[in-house]
């Protein structure tokens, strides 16, 4: 690491990229590269300040300077005073040695001019780089001369090594002596070297520091032979367990020594295990130790390892935090486009009740996680059956999932289906789009696109007409080419060769492709996922419902073109009894499979590998431990790194039975197995978590998990499992899944750095969407309250909404809608498409008896686009009532008539001559016929039924009599319903029905445990408004005008006859 960093000026904050012992050793300079005489050394506090140990903030104007230089200039005055005769602590020794090393590094990095330039400003006595280097050696040698700091022994000349510090020494195996390098660092020593061949022996080259035994006695912390009291004092000061006589070799019983260390060390102060393994006959309080582990054999021959804080470089994150039952992240996690996906089952309890296949995601290496997202809805036949998934992964760029259908009553498998969908990704491409002349289809070339018809794609900067924005795949030509349908065509061929363009796919906007596989025989569950190549993958399975057990895999060799085609293969039969839930992974042509042991009194889990995808196997049995959870794993280098969690406290060390129903403290372990050795006899299972919940909250059982590798870290995602309800401690008597009586089952992620020495911390972090989750208060009555305003920018799906008064005095409740649209009946009910409608009711239910009601019928309803107003009064205030379109719709109908109309004046009927044909007078044929029409008195039959002879008498005509007159006079065809004269009307009408609320019904529901619950469900019934029929009618105004014309003609004829008589 360089001790000099330079940045372009103009920023506010700058990073310090080197280590330093004191802030006074950090020098910040504004540089004018054109005129160095103008360079300005800044003063901390006035010109800049430290934001934290690795960041400064500029307070001064940087105008006139083009570079900000930050470098380290360590003072040569000893930071630690060795002359006072006091006992030095290990931290003092380390600081002194670091000071020497820092000065040497600065001598390496800084030029003579730079050293002179900052000599005064930094308070350094190093006049130039050579003086700094000599001073560093002087400090290091003075410390060593006092016998206070030893050399660090490294590898030998024969094996080779890169020496980077003055304190590192190499062994020359030929003479048994150690040598330090006295020249410029770093010094690379190739394998097969000697001191002579790699630089020579003498000042400025290799200098002997004596034989290895002497050096180890004086300065090696493992020795303490010549100066035992010095070492013991140091260890006691450091709270190193060896100060109390502990060996830490993993063989010697260190129980007594550790007990003494605990007794002598104040509570709250940690005992340092110095990275060693201590064998004990009973576990001490591990929380009081750091940087160590303990090997404990509660059962002889069955050792387990327990790691303390800082021994394993790992962190524990909580990645979900919901009131739901979040479990079963088993063998489904994967990494895609640098995002970690952790699929799991989200439900209200063990089983498939209200279950949704879900996932959470992390785009920042597991530091924070998204809110849970449901991938499946409830099954259409819910609550009889529901969806479930234990196998999911990405092949090429498409997500594949084995979606199982299971019964709620017994969790029994009834069907398997392979669902797949494109993952979201963004591509930056060059060329590859063509569009022929006079065609609307464009061909898109994207190697291994993984898309199917209907999948969403988005284009920008394509340089081809019509290929832009959101589109869908129209046809698939092959795995590298597909087409989209553009909105237009052009007269010439188009090709975007050489053009840079962008294409995106969307998981959420694309449909599932679903391939039904039916009920696969001899399968209890399908587990795990392993991508084999760009075309196919494997899924594990087990059968444990009936004997004999089966464990194996399904191999889908061509999942894109033949998703229903798979090959079934089993592990060796001697490993199948009592085995289940295989974890599978595929690395470098080898398929690995680990089973789960299911019986505490039988042999446990087993490990298998196959180089021909399950046709032949090499198998191992894990010794001693019975595993009641799966053992997910990943291959890192030559090691399989496996994780497993207990389902009962002390299961792995004391053989406790699988007991998910008891509140306890199950733990998580991990182990490594080298695939080149392929031997599990000496495998070490190391405890990495004591229990998974923060704050020491107990949980009743730890569920199965998944393992992924990203960059330099391995991630183990796992969760709680409780058979009774979503709460991990206790149970509510009514078994209401939405009442709180414990701590919810949630998911956790253990993140561990990959390396031969896994040490740093063992922390718990809350990574479940901090500051992004909706604040929810969850009361014990099952009601959730969101005490904050919320804004939804997309579709919001709600099963039931109650809007309460928004004011303290309960004056009103308001729904305020901004924009062009209000309530829209969007979705069609899946169980009854004909029932698409929206009901607005002024009362507390959907029945018109509770209040006035308006019902809007959707286009897919049996009564398409109908509006029904139901109330005792329909009042229109302060405005005219008008039809939208002029003279198009009628008021009432032949079967839906108003009884009467109350008007303040006579109605006005349009009689504009400009809208009529040339007027003609009544012809004699019509008037002759009209003379035969009878005017009568009558009573309505329905009125007679109600009132008898007191029914009112009406005046008018009979439409059928007018019809008969017209037929008799040749004005209508016999048996015809069509009349040329509008005075007579005939209408046929269809049967009219409606679905209305009838009553509430108590419905019983039985869960998988036989518990019966009841709900009150509304019952609707169909009512007939009227049956199919026909009606004859007349237009009264036509009758009046016809009668007037008839009478006028009659009077005219009488007047003509009188006039003729008078003339005689």
UniProtKB/Swiss-Prot annotation:
Its EC number is 3.2.1.129. Residues 1044-1064 form a coiled coil. The active site is at residues 581, 596, 647. The record marks 911-912 as: Cleavage. It comes from Escherichia phage K1F (Bacteriophage K1F). This is Tail spike protein. Changing residue 549 to A: Almost complete loss of enzymatic activity. Keywords: Coiled coil, Degradation of host capsule during virus entry, Degradation of host cell envelope components during virus entry, Glycosidase, Host-virus interaction, Hydrolase, Repeat, Viral attachment to host adhesion receptor, Viral attachment to host cell, Viral tail fiber protein, Viral tail protein, Virion, Virus entry into host cell. The record marks 542, 545, 549, 578, 598-599 as: Binding to sialic acid. BNR repeats lie at residues 360-371, 496-503, 608-619. Changing residue 911 to A: Complete loss of proteolytic processing. 190-fold reduced enzymatic activity. It holds the Pfam family End_N_terminal. GO terms for cellular component: virus tail, fiber. The lineage of its organism: Viruses, Duplodnaviria, Heunggongvirae, Uroviricota, Caudoviricetes. GO terms for molecular function: endo-alpha-(2,8)-sialidase activity; identical protein binding. GO terms for biological process: adhesion receptor-mediated virion attachment to host cell; symbiont entry into host; symbiont entry into host cell via disruption of host cell envelope; symbiont entry into host cell via disruption of host cell glycocalyx; virion attachment to host cell.
